[in-house]
Amino acid sequence: MEATGRGLFPNKPTLPAGPRKRGPLLPAAPPPPSPSSLPLDSLLLHLTAPAPAPAPAPRRSHQTPTPPHSFLSPDAQVLVLAISSHPLPTLAAFLASRRDELLRADITSLLKALELSGHWEWALALLRWAGKEGAADASALEMVVRALGREGQHDAVCALLDETPLPPGSRLDVRAYTTVLHALSRAGRYERALELFAELRRQGVAPTLVTYNVVLDVYGRMGRSWPRIVALLDEMRAAGVEPDGFTASTVIAACCRDGLVDEAVAFFEDLKARGHAPCVVTYNALLQVFGKAGNYTEALRVLGEMEQNGCQPDAVTYNELAGTYARAGFFEEAARCLDTMASKGLLPNAFTYNTVMTAYGNVGKVDEALALFDQMKKTGFVPNVNTYNLVLGMLGKKSRFTVMLEMLGEMSRSGCTPNRVTWNTMLAVCGKRGMEDYVTRVLEGMRSCGVELSRDTYNTLIAAYGRCGSRTNAFKMYNEMTSAGFTPCITTYNALLNVLSRQGDWSTAQSIVSKMRTKGFKPNEQSYSLLLQCYAKGGNVAGIAAIENEVYGSGAVFPSWVILRTLVIANFKCRRLDGMETAFQEVKARGYNPDLVIFNSMLSIYAKNGMYSKATEVFDSIKRSGLSPDLITYNSLMDMYAKCSESWEAEKILNQLKCSQTMKPDVVSYNTVINGFCKQGLVKEAQRVLSEMVADGMAPCAVTYHTLVGGYSSLEMFSEAREVIGYMVQHGLKPMELTYRRVVESYCRAKRFEEARGFLSEVSETDLDFDKKALEAYIEDAQFGR
């Protein structure tokens, strides 16, 4: 399209007079930062590099049993000494060379002597040899199983159970069975543990309290087992076995894993009604239930009851309290838990520091978290792999890759070997739009290092691919996970909801939530938050209203900080002012601290609705809360002034940003001021701001020119409007259909219908994708009143 009129742009510094004099002064908008800013090769190099050989751990000295075991004959004592002094790698050959002598001896007595002298590895080797020779009975197996249990060798217990079956008609004692059950639970072999428990009862072995507690723990770790837990508790009481503090904490922890808050409270109250006095472990478990549910008020009530009943909080109590504050957004209160612990003579541990660092990370205060990390090291705590993983995750979210590399180097130098969680953290860091290949490369590196994929890894992969916008790969990982034998958990379903929330596919999201419930899972605050995001993205206002009713009406969903924050954001995306105000008031009424996202959302909605006084009140609240306004805050404030026809005030803020050392305006900032001047009919001022925008190195976008076109059209300056459109096309910026409509509507308001048709003809020649039928019909309707 050719420019018409008196040559609007050649006289302005923002536009070139012609291509022969100089190149275009207005370049295309700069591309988004390349994903290659993530130094993936360097990160993978750190992760795959062999860890420095750790200093050899001091082994427990293995000396001749002292005093000599009276139950052994002199020959047997000599044999035990020979076995225990022989190197493990060649022990099997040594045992074979003494076969006849060993078969004449009492294997169980030899095993007992080895176990009592601390030689459990030699005892295990002897038992395996005896098993192959058919010389191991149930008592021998019991002896070694209990020894392995005391040493925490759960994998060895499981392997021994698989390779050394009991002779027909024999059975272990209840202590040995309980040890095996515990080992199977720790190894994640829950179904095998339950099979063994059923076998134990078939054999007539009466479970002890410890046995029942271990099986309750199995159910808790399995998840979705509340009816079975209740049934087992009834069985315990019927057998005359009363629950103890460990039983209580185990059952409540099971409720915590599945988000069963009501069930946990009912069980706790029933315990008290039966005369049980809760101990600190039980109270701590209940604190964790409320903490993970985001209900910090109930957590504080539990703490008060605990102290009132003379049960002194311990370090775990304050760890849970700090975690509760962290999840509720109270980072300052979480940090104060460290001071409270010190005042009570309690030493914080690595978990305490990790929890407070998480609180800082949740509100984006990474520098404060790093300062606490340094403080932790100065006070003598050696960061473990969990601490490093936590810090790496925070740095990754903020794209502070240089510091990430330094942290990985420090981790390697300290002899802290990256584990599966470290790899999972790297997968999560790569989970950003446009970085799908990075996720795949990290996954390949993980597999090449022999790191086995766990359920957590698959959950991370589903979420990472979802953030990359790859629904196909996300669901592929879900299918691969189930094919590998992993059972989806609530984290898995939430990861799938995260994928769907980015597409607004609320219908599929609802089916996922239904499936969760069918499988026995209770949606948690994250589930509802993601479902709200699905509704918001898909424009399903009725869906948002349904969850609001569960939060404010029936009380089926607890109004945690996460839920209320998401309600503010979801209603904002759907432009539901009433819904936003209700959620915002609930945030304040419940004592939560609104974060900058909540404040900015409220400021923006008030600005868009021209509610000057309320917007100003929100801005003042931001400053009073100690938060620092960001660019979104100032853009919303400029939008408010622009909509109130105070564009000069909006420009003042723009100029302040231009002079700021810490924050610079973006294209939205300039567009907002330009739009304000255009709406006031001050097109020359708008064009002046455009000139300054280009001079400041900010490339205008299609919205910038669309706004200017609208400003000229509203003043019936059609030549100028068409010249702007021509300039856009010349510089590779495609006008929106709405841009063309603004011009046509202005022509029609001016009763210049033929010029409107001529404009459409010119557009159709230069924009081959433009379908002019709808606008032609609009002109006909405007001209003939149809």
UniProtKB/Swiss-Prot annotation:
Region annotation Disordered: where it falls in the sequence = 1-71
Ranges of the PPR repeats in the UniProt entry:
137-167, 173-207, 208-243, 244-278, 279-313, 314-348, 349-383, 384-418, 419-453, 454-488, 489-523, 524-558, 560-594, 595-629, 630-664, 666-700, 701-735, 736-770
What is the consequence of disrupting this locus?
Answer: Yellow-green seedling phenotype. Seedling lethality after the development of three leaves. Defects in plastid mRNA metabolism and reduced levels of subunits of several photosynthetic enzyme complexes.
Q: Got a GO cellular component term for this one?
A: chloroplast stroma
Gene3D superfamilies associated with the record: Tetratricopeptide repeat domain
PROSITE patterns given in the database record? PPR
Q: Name one GO biological process term.
A: mRNA processing
GO molecular function terms listed in the Swiss-Prot or TrEMBL record: identical protein binding; mRNA binding
Chain segment of the transit peptide? 1-95
The primary site where this protein sits is: plastid
One protein family per Pfam: PPR_3
Bias kind Pro residues: ranges: 27-36
Keyword annotations for this protein, in alphabetical order, are: Chloroplast, mRNA processing, Plastid, Repeat, RNA-binding, Transit peptide
Bias type Low complexity, positions: 37-50
Localization: Plastid, Chloroplast stroma
Q: Which InterPro entries match?
A: Pentatricopeptide_rpt, TPR-like_helical_dom_sf
> Which family is annotated?
Belongs to the PPR family. P subfamily.
Q: How does it assemble?
A: Forms homodimers.
Q: What does this protein do?
A: Involved in chloroplast mRNA stability. Binds specifically to two intergenic RNA regions of similar sequence located in the chloroplast atpH 5'-UTR and psaJ 3'-UTR, and serves as a barrier to RNA decay. Binding to a specific site in the intergenic region of the chloroplast atpH is sufficient to block 5'-3' and 3'-5' exonucleases. Acts as a protein barrier to block mRNA degradation by exonucleases, and defines processed mRNA termini in chloroplasts. Remodels the structure of the atpH ribosome-binding site in a manner that can account for its ability to enhance translation.
Name-wise, this protein is Pentatricopeptide repeat-containing protein 10, chloroplastic
Organism, by scientific name, is Zea mays (Maize)
**What is this protein's gene name?**
PPR10
